[in-house]
Amino acid sequence: MKRQALIGLFVLAASTSFAQFFRPAPLNEAENYELKMGKVTMRIDAANGARITSLKHDTTEVISQTPQPNMYGSTFWTSPQKEWNWPPVREHDIMRYDVEQKDSVITMTSQLSAKIPLRIRKQFAVDKKNECIVVTYSIINEGEQERKVAPWEITRVPAEGTIFFDAPLSAITPAGLMNFVEKDGLSTFDIDQAEKQRKINADGKGWLGYRNKGLLLMKRFQDLTPEQPAPDEAEIQVYVHQGKVYVELEEQGAYTTLKPGEKLDWAVRWYLQPEKSKRKLY
């Protein structure tokens, strides 16, 4: 019997202790919103970059809750990174987003970047038919010149569990940096620890999976050809922070030219279910 999708949408008042539980010293006091679908709850903090700070199935959390200033939750950047270097653009990554709610859809819009003239819009909605949460990102060129840009979602999860995607081992670069193995036709990485930061690139098939604590998180997005990502970037990236801190599940969209006033839209579909669920996601 198909599960009934239930939508719950409301603002959560944030106490100081609540904010500290999710991260230390936020830029602003948290302004949290929630989407609910059956047993899945997604929480978004509009006051701090419109980040996804929590994703739970019942009471089991899949987003990393390890305290890391500014390096927490699921965020969004523009690609390639060389356009802004480091740190990430504050208006996109950590500053407050304006919020609009309509028909059980949450839309959050960034301030215009002082570094690059791009505005980010994030729309969060429940897809009842497919039992997932859809996050649609928009990049809007509000400058006076053409810009080439790609969308980039970064999701931080605990440094445990298994990451997998559909790509040959030979296509993962740099080779040998992480202990990926072939299992059931997929490239699979049981997260381990090392005293250095590691990051790999791969050309996948439009999805990225993560298993931990008996749950399966699946993110689905546009499948790219090897020529479509931004220069020196990739459709799928995995970053492992040194030690046992957090891991980033990253995916990018196509490198696109935006004329002044134009925008691009890019959707990521989030599925979360018990690993032993009968529904097949890959």
Report the location of each language-model feature.
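Bacterial Sec-dependent N-terminal signal peptides
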Residues: 1-21
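Hydrophobic core residues within well-ordered beta-strands of beta-rich domains
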Residues: 120, 133-135, 264
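Extended, loop-rich substrate-binding clefts of extracytoplasmic carbohydrate-active enzymes
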Residues: 21-23, 27, 81-130, 148-149, ...
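Short N-terminal segments immediately surrounding and downstream of signal-peptide cleavage
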Residues: 20-38
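A contiguous, surface-exposed recognition patch within enzymatic or periplasmic domains that forms
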Residues: 40-42, 50-53, 61, 131, ...
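Acidic-aromatic substrate-binding/catalytic surfaces of carbohydrate-active enzymes
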Residues: 32-93
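Terminal connector regions
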Residues: 272-282
